[in-house]
Amino acid sequence: MHQEIQSEVVIIGSGPAGYSAAFRCADLGLETVLIEHQERLGGVCLNVGCIPSKSLLHIAKIIKDASELSESGVFFNKPIIDIKKINNWKEKIIKKLTTGLSNMGEKRKVRIVQGKALFNTDHSVLVKNKKNDFTIFFKHAIIATGSKPIKIPSLPNEDNRIWNSTDALSLKSIPNRFLIIGGGIIGLEMATIYSALGSKVDIVDRFNAFLPSVDKDITDIYIKSIKKRFKLLLNTHVKSVEKSKDNDLIVKIAEENSDENVCCYDNILVAIGRSPNVDFLGLEKIGLKLNESGFIEINQQLKTNISHIYAIGDVTGFPMLAHKAVQQAHIAAEVISGKKHYFEPKVIPSVAYTDPEIAWVGLSEKEAENNDIDYEVSLFPWSASGRAHASNCTLGMTKLIFNKNTNKIIGGSIIGTNASELISEIGLAIEMGSDAEDISLTIHPHPTLSESISLASEVFQGTITDLLNLKKSLLN
């Protein structure tokens, strides 16, 4: 059956970008249609990404923490892993959140249409599902179709033992020997999960620099922390994957300027990045422009080259982060409603939800150097934090970068427990143009990990009393 729908705004995709845009449009009084080809709202993030990965990382951390408590005089037996129960628990979390989204959409009177969207014209889309097809006419459209995992064409991808991130998060099995190709955030998080569950994990990454966006003094702490849990092989790549007579996956691994190694694995995860989901939309038909990397070109109001069609989230390029997407969604909806708003954040924080966590925001040292900024680094090691000692998490550090001419904070990074929860203070300080004195004179509760931020500012100020004050002779 064919139906025609008229709407002020149509949004394609219901991940964090799409549902946020739809709900904001509805709140602003705009008649809104939200198109989603999956059965549930929430996109990759809620269903097969951010949320399920954090639930499994939570389990992994508890397993690790419990094993370390023996040093404090508390002993636990070796954990029993019940995959079925873990998956049921994970599914309950996802279902609760997706149901909540559907309820919020219904209460806002957002019309939800299930199916894949294809642009007919620059003012209409065709949507088909198993039962119906729709032509939806719109004044404005927002493309929020997200991204998909990149495959390695040379691998036997038809083999169901070669996984992408969605497969890994479905927790089909716990491989004894697990190879992860790609040492980025996704690969590291999966290594954290599966090593805690009992897998012997190797990570290979073809690049020489580990997490190149993060300063080396931070990543060195992380590399030190993982040595007993899994192996990280940099400057290394997979040459081939074959099946043995015993049906193992035989992998040839080559390090640059070194001999090949042949290893056997039960499963392989390919985590080399993601690409935008734009192939099925028919964008070429309406003349909507993509850049050289295949992402949709936008301006600061999230408009494409077709001024009434907007794009937000992963389809617009790096950083491909849900929190960036949500902010873009709000701006796009507000621009459509007539507000003169722009997407122009000073900084966007990034987090690797590993153990320990790594979080960073603003400029790194290398970026400050490349921008010819006269900067100074201020460090507070968590080995000097009372809360870190009490919580058994002294392997950590808070690092701030200040402009020496203005004393303003321009960047920061944290490695350690709950770094993801701490980094926002640094982001806010940069957005507000705060200087070191603003941060150091803001009284932080004690004992906390968050006070490491004010203490790092005190190091820069030369007022620190929790460490030896190396600047005192300069300030007298």
Swiss-Prot record:
GO terms for cellular component: cytoplasm. The active site is at H446. It catalyses: N(6)-[(R)-dihydrolipoyl]-L-lysyl-[protein] + NAD(+) = N(6)-[(R)-lipoyl]-L-lysyl-[protein] + NADH + H(+). InterPro entries: Class-I_Pyr_Nuc-Dis_Oxidored (IPR050151), FAD/NAD-bd_sf (IPR036188), FAD/NAD-binding_dom (IPR023753), FAD/NAD-linked_Rdtase_dimer_sf (IPR016156), Lipoamide_DH (IPR006258), Pyr_nuc-diS_OxRdtase (IPR001100), Pyr_nucl-diS_OxRdtase_dimer (IPR004099), Pyr_OxRdtase_I_AS (IPR012999). It is found in: Cytoplasm. Keywords: Cytoplasm, Disulfide bond, FAD, Flavoprotein, NAD, Oxidoreductase, Redox-active center. This is Dihydrolipoyl dehydrogenase. The gene is lpdA.
